[in-house]
Amino acid sequence: MKTLNVIGQNFAALDCVTAMTDVTGFALLGHLLEICQGSEVAAVIDFNKVPCLDFVHDYIDQGCIPGGCDRNFISYGDDVGPLNDKQKTLLCDPQTSGGLLVAVKPEGREAFETLCQDNGLNLQPIGELVTEISPVVSLL
């Protein structure tokens, strides 16, 4: 929690941003599902592109997993494609003050990335929204 999410105000001013939410207690998957279900689309996520602090894997290997991970998965796992244990732990991990999840139209990607770079943010896409399919969220 080094900085506030004030950049969200700038993101919201871009016409290419179609949805945005902070990633908190329902974790990345829960908030992504809210966007998908509210917009009647699905998402395909490249798990290897989801940012994660390096030391988190050590904690997972030690079995230090928040109880909220399982509760989150129980509440929305039926709408998610198959996940291994590590994917489930990372993608269902409840956050107190997570980052922003932003949906950007493909034609606006350059403008979005320029705004990010101008604000010292090095962001990359983690997936894409697609015509609604089942499951609502799937991983590559």
Predicted regions and their residues:
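Glycine-/charge-enriched secondary-structure boundary and capping motifs
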Residues: 13-140
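Active-site glycine-rich loop that binds ribose-phosphate moieties when present
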Residues: 1-12
